[in-house]
Amino acid sequence: MPLRLHDTRSRGLREFQPADPPRVTMYVCGATVQAPPHIGHLRSGLVFDVLVRWLAVHGYDVVFCRNVTDIDDKILRVAAAEGIPWWQVAYRNYRLFDSAYRLLGCVPPTVEPWATGHIPQIIALIRRLIDAGHAYPAGGDVYFAVRSFPAYGGLSGRDPDALQAGESDGVHKRDPLDFALWKGAKPGEPSWESPWGPGRPGWHIECSAMSTTYLGSTFDIHGGGLDLLFPHHENECAQSQAAGDGFARYWLHNGLVTLRGEKMSKSLGNVLSMDQLLELVRPIELRYYLIGAHYRSTLDFSEESLEEAAAAYRRIEGFLLRAQELVGELPAADPQTGLIDRLPPEFVAALDDDLAVPRALAVMHSVVRQGNAALAETDKTAVRRFLGEVTAMLDVMGLRPPDDGSRLDALRRVVDNLARLVLDEREAARQRRDFATADALRARLTDAGIVVEDTPSGPRWHLRDLDLP
Protein backbone atom coordinates (compact mmCIF):
# COMPACT_ATOMS: atom_id res chain seq x y z
CA MET A 1 0.00 0.00 0.00
CA PRO A 2 1.41 3.44 -0.86
CA LEU A 3 1.88 6.09 1.80
CA ARG A 4 -1.33 8.05 2.33
CA LEU A 5 -1.62 11.24 4.37
CA HIS A 6 -4.62 13.27 5.49
CA ASP A 7 -4.57 16.55 3.59
CA THR A 8 -6.36 19.34 5.43
CA ARG A 9 -7.24 21.21 2.24
CA SER A 10 -8.95 18.25 0.55
CA ARG A 11 -10.28 16.99 3.91
CA GLY A 12 -9.34 13.39 3.19
CA LEU A 13 -6.57 10.88 2.64
CA ARG A 14 -4.36 11.38 -0.39
CA GLU A 15 -1.62 9.17 -1.75
CA PHE A 16 1.65 10.96 -1.13
CA GLN A 17 3.50 11.70 -4.34
CA PRO A 18 6.30 14.27 -4.06
CA ALA A 19 6.73 16.75 -6.88
CA ASP A 20 10.38 15.84 -7.48
CA PRO A 21 11.15 12.36 -6.11
CA PRO A 22 13.22 11.21 -4.35
CA ARG A 23 13.41 14.74 -2.93
CA VAL A 24 10.70 15.70 -0.44
CA THR A 25 10.39 19.29 0.74
CA MET A 26 8.64 19.94 4.05
CA TYR A 27 8.02 23.08 6.09
CA VAL A 28 6.79 22.97 9.68
CA CYS A 29 5.86 26.03 11.70
CA GLY A 30 8.29 26.09 14.59
CA ALA A 31 8.25 27.95 17.84
CA THR A 32 7.38 31.53 18.60
CA VAL A 33 10.00 31.78 21.30
CA GLN A 34 8.35 34.01 23.90
CA ALA A 35 8.30 31.27 26.56
CA PRO A 36 9.75 27.82 27.29
CA PRO A 37 8.27 24.84 25.42
CA HIS A 38 5.22 23.09 26.79
CA ILE A 39 3.69 19.70 26.06
CA GLY A 40 1.75 20.96 23.03
CA HIS A 41 4.93 22.19 21.34
CA LEU A 42 6.65 18.90 22.14
CA ARG A 43 3.87 16.82 20.64
CA SER A 44 3.89 18.80 17.40
CA GLY A 45 7.66 18.50 17.11
CA LEU A 46 7.50 14.74 17.62
CA VAL A 47 4.63 14.19 15.17
CA PHE A 48 6.61 15.66 12.32
CA ASP A 49 9.78 13.95 13.49
CA VAL A 50 8.03 10.59 12.97
CA LEU A 51 6.95 11.75 9.51
CA VAL A 52 10.51 12.77 8.57
CA ARG A 53 11.80 9.39 9.73
CA TRP A 54 9.12 7.46 7.86
CA LEU A 55 9.72 9.36 4.64
CA ALA A 56 13.42 8.49 4.97
CA VAL A 57 12.52 4.81 5.41
CA HIS A 58 10.63 5.07 2.11
CA GLY A 59 13.89 6.18 0.53
CA TYR A 60 13.08 9.87 0.20
CA ASP A 61 15.68 12.60 0.63
CA VAL A 62 13.85 14.95 3.00
CA VAL A 63 14.63 18.66 3.05
CA PHE A 64 13.05 19.68 6.34
CA CYS A 65 12.66 23.38 7.16
CA ARG A 66 11.39 24.43 10.60
CA ASN A 67 11.38 28.14 11.37
CA VAL A 68 11.94 30.18 14.51
CA THR A 69 9.69 33.21 15.03
CA ASP A 70 12.02 35.48 16.98
CA ILE A 71 10.10 38.76 16.60
CA ASP A 72 6.46 38.95 17.62
CA ASP A 73 4.06 40.98 19.77
CA LYS A 74 4.21 38.36 22.53
CA ILE A 75 8.01 38.39 22.61
CA LEU A 76 7.99 42.17 22.88
CA ARG A 77 5.50 42.06 25.77
CA VAL A 78 7.67 39.58 27.69
CA ALA A 79 10.78 41.67 27.06
CA ALA A 80 9.04 44.82 28.29
CA ALA A 81 7.74 43.06 31.40
CA GLU A 82 11.20 41.70 32.26
CA GLY A 83 13.08 44.84 31.24
CA ILE A 84 15.44 42.99 28.91
CA PRO A 85 16.09 43.16 25.14
CA TRP A 86 13.65 41.27 22.91
CA TRP A 87 16.43 39.22 21.34
CA GLN A 88 17.49 37.99 24.78
CA VAL A 89 13.98 36.60 25.36
CA ALA A 90 14.02 34.95 21.95
CA TYR A 91 17.44 33.36 22.26
CA ARG A 92 16.88 32.18 25.83
CA ASN A 93 13.71 30.33 24.90
CA TYR A 94 15.09 29.06 21.59
CA ARG A 95 17.83 27.28 23.52
CA LEU A 96 15.18 25.61 25.69
CA PHE A 97 13.24 24.47 22.61
CA ASP A 98 16.40 23.17 20.96
CA SER A 99 17.41 21.30 24.11
CA ALA A 100 13.94 19.75 24.46
CA TYR A 101 13.85 18.56 20.84
CA ARG A 102 17.29 17.02 21.19
CA LEU A 103 16.44 15.36 24.49
CA LEU A 104 13.36 13.79 22.89
CA GLY A 105 15.42 12.46 19.99
CA CYS A 106 14.08 14.69 17.21
CA VAL A 107 15.99 14.69 13.94
CA PRO A 108 17.41 18.23 13.48
CA PRO A 109 15.85 20.17 10.60
CA THR A 110 17.86 20.56 7.41
CA VAL A 111 17.53 24.31 7.83
CA GLU A 112 16.16 26.36 10.73
CA PRO A 113 15.63 29.96 9.58
CA TRP A 114 14.98 32.83 11.98
CA ALA A 115 12.47 35.47 10.94
CA THR A 116 14.74 38.46 11.61
CA GLY A 117 17.39 36.96 9.34
CA HIS A 118 15.04 37.20 6.34
CA ILE A 119 13.85 40.81 6.28
CA PRO A 120 14.96 41.36 2.62
CA GLN A 121 13.00 38.29 1.47
CA ILE A 122 9.95 39.41 3.44
CA ILE A 123 10.08 42.90 1.94
CA ALA A 124 10.44 41.44 -1.57
CA LEU A 125 7.35 39.27 -1.08
CA ILE A 126 5.31 42.20 0.22
CA ARG A 127 6.32 44.24 -2.85
CA ARG A 128 5.06 41.45 -5.11
CA LEU A 129 1.72 41.46 -3.33
CA ILE A 130 1.37 45.23 -3.64
CA ASP A 131 2.29 45.09 -7.33
CA ALA A 132 -0.33 42.35 -7.88
CA GLY A 133 -3.04 44.41 -6.20
CA HIS A 134 -3.41 42.10 -3.19
CA ALA A 135 -1.83 44.40 -0.59
CA TYR A 136 -1.77 48.11 0.19
CA PRO A 137 0.35 50.45 2.34
CA ALA A 138 -1.49 52.58 4.88
CA GLY A 139 -0.06 54.80 7.60
CA GLY A 140 3.31 53.05 7.68
CA ASP A 141 1.70 49.60 7.76
CA VAL A 142 1.05 47.24 4.86
CA TYR A 143 -2.07 45.04 4.79
CA PHE A 144 -3.17 42.04 2.78
CA ALA A 145 -6.53 42.71 1.12
CA VAL A 146 -8.43 39.54 1.99
CA ARG A 147 -11.33 40.12 -0.40
CA SER A 148 -8.93 40.54 -3.32
CA PHE A 149 -8.25 36.80 -3.10
CA PRO A 150 -11.50 34.87 -3.81
CA ALA A 151 -10.08 31.54 -2.60
CA TYR A 152 -9.55 32.89 0.94
CA GLY A 153 -10.99 30.47 3.49
CA GLY A 154 -10.53 27.40 1.30
CA LEU A 155 -7.85 25.80 3.43
CA SER A 156 -9.72 26.03 6.74
CA GLY A 157 -13.21 25.75 5.26
CA ARG A 158 -14.33 29.19 6.40
CA ASP A 159 -16.59 31.66 4.62
CA PRO A 160 -14.98 35.14 4.61
CA ASP A 161 -18.40 36.77 4.89
CA ALA A 162 -18.99 34.96 8.19
CA LEU A 163 -15.62 35.85 9.70
CA GLN A 164 -15.03 38.38 12.44
CA ALA A 165 -12.31 41.00 12.23
CA GLY A 166 -8.87 39.68 13.07
CA GLU A 167 -6.21 42.10 14.31
CA SER A 168 -7.77 44.87 16.36
CA ASP A 169 -4.83 47.26 16.13
CA GLY A 170 -5.11 47.98 12.42
CA VAL A 171 -6.66 51.45 12.41
CA HIS A 172 -5.63 52.00 8.78
CA LYS A 173 -7.30 48.87 7.38
CA ARG A 174 -9.68 49.19 4.47
CA ASP A 175 -11.53 46.05 5.59
CA PRO A 176 -11.73 44.58 9.11
CA LEU A 177 -10.69 41.17 7.70
CA ASP A 178 -7.39 42.45 6.31
CA PHE A 179 -4.23 41.47 8.17
CA ALA A 180 -0.83 43.09 8.57
CA LEU A 181 2.11 42.16 6.38
CA TRP A 182 4.27 44.98 7.73
CA LYS A 183 3.79 46.88 10.99
CA GLY A 184 5.02 50.46 11.21
CA ALA A 185 7.57 51.22 13.92
CA LYS A 186 6.36 52.09 17.41
CA PRO A 187 8.40 53.82 20.11
CA GLY A 188 10.66 51.41 21.95
CA GLU A 189 10.13 48.54 19.50
CA PRO A 190 12.75 47.07 17.15
CA SER A 191 12.41 48.07 13.52
CA TRP A 192 13.97 47.58 10.10
CA GLU A 193 14.02 49.93 7.13
CA SER A 194 11.54 49.27 4.34
CA PRO A 195 10.02 51.12 1.34
CA TRP A 196 7.05 51.96 3.62
CA GLY A 197 9.13 53.30 6.47
CA PRO A 198 10.73 51.60 9.47
CA GLY A 199 8.83 48.69 10.97
CA ARG A 200 8.78 44.95 11.42
CA PRO A 201 7.12 42.04 9.63
CA GLY A 202 3.78 40.51 10.49
CA TRP A 203 3.73 36.92 11.68
CA HIS A 204 2.12 35.30 8.64
CA ILE A 205 4.38 36.83 5.99
CA GLU A 206 7.47 35.56 7.82
CA CYS A 207 6.57 31.92 7.22
CA SER A 208 5.65 32.48 3.57
CA ALA A 209 8.98 34.15 2.88
CA MET A 210 11.11 31.62 4.76
CA SER A 211 9.41 28.50 3.37
CA THR A 212 9.70 29.58 -0.26
CA THR A 213 13.25 30.85 0.22
CA TYR A 214 14.50 27.39 1.17
CA LEU A 215 12.00 25.05 -0.47
CA GLY A 216 10.95 26.89 -3.62
CA SER A 217 7.69 28.49 -4.71
CA THR A 218 5.94 25.10 -4.55
CA PHE A 219 6.88 22.48 -1.97
CA ASP A 220 5.45 19.17 -0.84
CA ILE A 221 4.29 19.36 2.78
CA HIS A 222 3.33 22.12 5.19
CA GLY A 223 2.74 21.04 8.77
CA GLY A 224 1.82 22.47 12.13
CA GLY A 225 -0.59 22.29 15.03
CA LEU A 226 -4.33 22.43 14.46
CA ASP A 227 -4.42 25.70 16.40
CA LEU A 228 -2.41 27.30 13.57
CA LEU A 229 -4.88 26.34 10.82
CA PHE A 230 -6.76 29.62 11.18
CA PRO A 231 -5.79 32.34 10.84
CA HIS A 232 -2.06 31.63 10.48
CA HIS A 233 -2.01 28.93 7.82
CA GLU A 234 -5.02 30.33 5.99
CA ASN A 235 -3.24 33.69 5.75
CA GLU A 236 0.04 32.08 4.72
CA CYS A 237 -1.68 30.15 1.97
CA ALA A 238 -3.64 33.14 0.70
CA GLN A 239 -0.75 35.61 0.55
CA SER A 240 1.62 33.08 -1.02
CA GLN A 241 -0.79 32.02 -3.74
CA ALA A 242 -1.83 35.62 -4.33
CA ALA A 243 1.85 36.36 -4.99
CA GLY A 244 1.90 33.63 -7.65
CA ASP A 245 3.44 30.80 -5.62
CA GLY A 246 1.93 27.33 -5.73
CA PHE A 247 2.93 26.95 -2.08
CA ALA A 248 2.18 23.69 -0.19
CA ARG A 249 0.83 20.63 -2.01
CA TYR A 250 -0.18 18.79 1.18
CA TRP A 251 -1.26 20.33 4.49
CA LEU A 252 -0.92 18.27 7.69
CA HIS A 253 -2.15 19.30 11.13
CA ASN A 254 -1.65 17.58 14.45
CA GLY A 255 -4.27 17.56 17.19
CA LEU A 256 -4.04 19.54 20.40
CA VAL A 257 -3.14 18.44 23.92
CA THR A 258 -5.81 19.00 26.55
CA LEU A 259 -5.92 18.62 30.32
CA ARG A 260 -9.17 17.13 31.61
CA GLY A 261 -10.81 18.10 28.34
CA GLU A 262 -9.67 21.73 28.48
CA LYS A 263 -7.22 23.27 26.01
CA MET A 264 -3.90 24.06 27.65
CA SER A 265 -3.02 27.74 27.78
CA LYS A 266 -0.91 30.02 29.92
CA SER A 267 -3.93 32.17 30.69
CA LEU A 268 -5.65 29.16 32.28
CA GLY A 269 -2.47 28.23 34.13
CA ASN A 270 -2.64 24.61 33.00
CA VAL A 271 0.36 24.24 30.70
CA LEU A 272 2.85 21.47 31.41
CA SER A 273 6.51 22.24 30.90
CA MET A 274 9.27 19.87 29.87
CA ASP A 275 10.75 20.01 33.38
CA GLN A 276 7.42 19.08 34.98
CA LEU A 277 6.99 16.13 32.64
CA LEU A 278 10.53 14.86 33.21
CA GLU A 279 9.85 14.72 36.93
CA LEU A 280 7.40 11.93 36.09
CA VAL A 281 9.09 9.93 33.32
CA ARG A 282 12.31 9.66 31.30
CA PRO A 283 12.61 11.54 27.97
CA ILE A 284 12.30 8.31 25.94
CA GLU A 285 9.10 7.41 27.81
CA LEU A 286 7.72 10.89 27.19
CA ARG A 287 8.46 10.47 23.48
CA TYR A 288 6.62 7.12 23.49
CA TYR A 289 3.63 8.75 25.16
CA LEU A 290 3.41 11.79 22.88
CA ILE A 291 3.59 9.82 19.64
CA GLY A 292 1.35 7.04 20.96
CA ALA A 293 -1.98 8.67 20.09
CA HIS A 294 -2.84 9.22 16.43
CA TYR A 295 -1.36 12.54 15.41
CA ARG A 296 -4.69 14.04 14.29
CA SER A 297 -6.50 13.13 17.50
CA THR A 298 -6.73 15.23 20.64
CA LEU A 299 -4.43 13.94 23.37
CA ASP A 300 -6.06 14.43 26.77
CA PHE A 301 -3.18 14.39 29.24
CA SER A 302 -3.28 12.63 32.58
CA GLU A 303 -0.54 11.36 34.84
CA GLU A 304 -2.21 7.96 34.76
CA SER A 305 -2.02 7.67 30.97
CA LEU A 306 1.57 8.91 31.02
CA GLU A 307 2.51 6.27 33.60
CA GLU A 308 0.74 3.56 31.57
CA ALA A 309 2.74 4.55 28.49
CA ALA A 310 5.98 4.51 30.48
CA ALA A 311 5.15 1.02 31.78
CA ALA A 312 4.42 -0.16 28.24
CA TYR A 313 7.77 1.16 27.06
CA ARG A 314 9.54 -0.53 29.96
CA ARG A 315 8.04 -3.85 28.85
CA ILE A 316 9.79 -3.38 25.53
CA GLU A 317 13.01 -2.57 27.37
CA GLY A 318 12.57 -5.68 29.51
CA PHE A 319 12.44 -7.83 26.40
CA LEU A 320 15.54 -6.15 24.99
CA LEU A 321 17.41 -6.77 28.23
CA ARG A 322 16.49 -10.45 28.43
CA ALA A 323 17.10 -11.02 24.73
CA GLN A 324 20.52 -9.39 24.97
CA GLU A 325 21.30 -11.65 27.91
CA LEU A 326 20.57 -14.69 25.72
CA VAL A 327 21.93 -13.75 22.28
CA GLY A 328 24.43 -10.97 22.95
CA GLU A 329 24.55 -7.33 21.89
CA LEU A 330 21.59 -5.51 20.41
CA PRO A 331 21.65 -5.11 16.62
CA ALA A 332 23.35 -1.89 15.53
CA ALA A 333 21.09 1.06 14.77
CA ASP A 334 19.83 0.46 11.26
CA PRO A 335 20.13 3.14 8.57
CA GLN A 336 16.70 4.26 7.42
CA THR A 337 17.32 3.51 3.74
CA GLY A 338 16.43 -0.08 2.90
CA LEU A 339 14.95 -0.69 6.33
CA ILE A 340 11.38 -1.03 5.08
CA ASP A 341 12.00 -4.56 3.79
CA ARG A 342 13.06 -5.71 7.26
CA LEU A 343 9.97 -4.45 9.09
CA PRO A 344 6.83 -6.50 9.79
CA PRO A 345 4.32 -5.88 6.96
CA GLU A 346 1.59 -4.93 9.46
CA PHE A 347 3.86 -2.26 10.92
CA VAL A 348 4.56 -0.81 7.47
CA ALA A 349 0.86 -0.87 6.59
CA ALA A 350 0.01 1.01 9.78
CA LEU A 351 2.46 3.86 9.19
CA ASP A 352 1.57 4.03 5.50
CA ASP A 353 -2.04 4.60 6.57
CA ASP A 354 -1.72 8.24 7.65
CA LEU A 355 0.95 7.48 10.26
CA ALA A 356 -1.26 5.21 12.39
CA VAL A 357 1.31 5.01 15.19
CA PRO A 358 -1.08 3.35 17.70
CA ARG A 359 -1.49 0.40 15.31
CA ALA A 360 2.26 0.32 14.68
CA LEU A 361 2.95 0.18 18.42
CA ALA A 362 0.41 -2.64 18.77
CA VAL A 363 2.39 -4.60 16.16
CA MET A 364 5.59 -3.94 18.11
CA HIS A 365 4.09 -5.22 21.35
CA SER A 366 2.81 -8.31 19.55
CA VAL A 367 6.34 -9.07 18.36
CA VAL A 368 7.66 -8.44 21.88
CA ARG A 369 5.20 -11.03 23.23
CA GLN A 370 6.36 -13.52 20.60
CA GLY A 371 9.93 -12.74 21.58
CA ASN A 372 9.18 -13.35 25.25
CA ALA A 373 7.63 -16.72 24.36
CA ALA A 374 10.79 -17.60 22.41
CA LEU A 375 12.88 -16.56 25.41
CA ALA A 376 10.88 -18.92 27.62
CA GLU A 377 11.81 -21.72 25.20
CA THR A 378 15.44 -20.52 24.99
CA ASP A 379 15.03 -20.47 21.20
CA LYS A 380 18.02 -18.34 20.23
CA THR A 381 17.21 -18.28 16.52
CA ALA A 382 13.67 -17.01 17.10
CA VAL A 383 14.79 -14.57 19.79
CA ARG A 384 17.40 -13.11 17.46
CA ARG A 385 14.78 -12.68 14.71
CA PHE A 386 12.24 -11.02 16.99
CA LEU A 387 14.95 -8.85 18.52
CA GLY A 388 15.92 -7.64 15.04
CA GLU A 389 12.31 -6.76 14.21
CA VAL A 390 11.73 -4.91 17.49
CA THR A 391 14.93 -2.87 17.25
CA ALA A 392 14.15 -2.00 13.62
CA MET A 393 10.70 -0.73 14.61
CA LEU A 394 12.18 1.21 17.51
CA ASP A 395 14.72 2.81 15.17
CA VAL A 396 11.97 3.91 12.77
CA MET A 397 10.12 5.76 15.52
CA GLY A 398 13.15 7.06 17.38
CA LEU A 399 12.39 4.84 20.37
CA ARG A 400 15.56 2.81 20.75
CA PRO A 401 16.64 2.99 24.41
CA PRO A 402 19.24 5.71 24.97
CA ASP A 403 22.89 4.67 24.84
CA ASP A 404 21.78 1.39 23.25
CA GLY A 405 23.67 -1.58 24.64
CA SER A 406 25.76 0.37 27.14
CA ARG A 407 22.65 1.45 29.05
CA LEU A 408 21.29 -2.09 29.07
CA ASP A 409 24.68 -3.37 30.22
CA ALA A 410 24.65 -0.89 33.09
CA LEU A 411 21.11 -1.89 34.04
CA ARG A 412 22.09 -5.56 33.86
CA ARG A 413 25.01 -4.94 36.23
CA VAL A 414 22.80 -3.11 38.72
CA VAL A 415 20.23 -5.92 38.73
CA ASP A 416 23.00 -8.52 38.96
CA ASN A 417 24.58 -6.81 41.97
CA LEU A 418 21.25 -6.55 43.78
CA ALA A 419 20.36 -10.17 42.99
CA ARG A 420 23.76 -11.34 44.21
CA LEU A 421 23.31 -9.57 47.54
CA VAL A 422 20.06 -11.44 48.16
CA LEU A 423 21.47 -14.74 46.85
CA ASP A 424 24.48 -14.45 49.15
CA GLU A 425 22.15 -13.91 52.11
CA ARG A 426 20.03 -16.87 50.96
CA GLU A 427 23.11 -19.07 50.69
CA ALA A 428 24.17 -18.08 54.21
CA ALA A 429 20.71 -19.04 55.49
CA ARG A 430 20.97 -22.42 53.77
CA GLN A 431 24.36 -23.01 55.35
CA ARG A 432 22.72 -22.34 58.73
CA ARG A 433 19.98 -24.78 57.68
CA ASP A 434 17.50 -21.92 58.05
CA PHE A 435 15.49 -23.11 55.06
CA ALA A 436 12.45 -21.00 55.90
CA THR A 437 14.49 -17.81 55.50
CA ALA A 438 16.17 -19.17 52.35
CA ASP A 439 12.77 -19.96 50.79
CA ALA A 440 11.41 -16.56 51.78
CA LEU A 441 14.34 -14.78 50.12
CA ARG A 442 13.87 -16.82 46.95
CA ALA A 443 10.17 -15.93 46.97
CA ARG A 444 11.05 -12.24 47.35
CA LEU A 445 13.25 -12.46 44.25
CA THR A 446 10.50 -14.26 42.34
CA ASP A 447 8.01 -11.54 43.29
CA ALA A 448 10.51 -8.98 41.95
CA GLY A 449 10.65 -10.81 38.61
CA ILE A 450 13.94 -12.67 39.21
CA VAL A 451 13.81 -16.44 38.76
CA VAL A 452 16.46 -18.42 40.71
CA GLU A 453 17.78 -21.78 39.51
CA ASP A 454 19.90 -23.90 41.84
CA THR A 455 22.65 -25.66 39.85
CA PRO A 456 25.61 -27.85 40.87
CA SER A 457 27.87 -24.83 40.35
CA GLY A 458 25.70 -22.55 42.45
CA PRO A 459 22.52 -20.49 42.05
CA ARG A 460 21.84 -18.70 38.76
CA TRP A 461 19.16 -16.18 37.98
CA HIS A 462 17.29 -14.71 35.02
CA LEU A 463 14.48 -12.23 34.58
CA ARG A 464 10.98 -13.59 34.38
CA ASP A 465 8.81 -12.59 31.42
CA LEU A 466 7.75 -9.13 32.56
CA ASP A 467 5.40 -8.47 29.65
CA LEU A 468 1.88 -7.85 30.87
CA PRO A 469 -1.23 -8.86 28.93
Swiss-Prot record:
SMART domains: DALR_2. Gene3D superfamilies: Cysteine-tRNA ligase, C-terminal anti-codon recognition domain, HUPs. The gene is cysS. It catalyses: tRNA(Cys) + L-cysteine + ATP = L-cysteinyl-tRNA(Cys) + AMP + diphosphate. SUPFAM superfamilies: Anticodon-binding domain of a subclass of class I aminoacyl-tRNA synthetases, Nucleotidylyl transferase. GO terms for cellular component: cytosol. Belongs to the class-I aminoacyl-tRNA synthetase family. Its cofactor is Zn(2+). This is Cysteine--tRNA ligase. InterPro entries: Cys-tRNA-ligase (IPR015803), Cys-tRNA-synt_Ia_DALR (IPR015273), Cys-tRNA/MSH_ligase (IPR024909), CysS_C (IPR056411), Rossmann-like_a/b/a_fold (IPR014729), tRNA-synt_1_cat_dom (IPR032678), tRNAsynth_Ia_anticodon-bd (IPR009080). The lineage of its organism: Bacteria, Bacillati, Actinomycetota, Actinomycetes, Acidothermales. Keywords: Aminoacyl-tRNA synthetase, ATP-binding, Cytoplasm, Ligase, Metal-binding, Nucleotide-binding, Protein biosynthesis, Zinc. It comes from Acidothermus cellulolyticus (strain ATCC 43068 / DSM 8971 / 11B). HAMAP family: Cys_tRNA_synth.
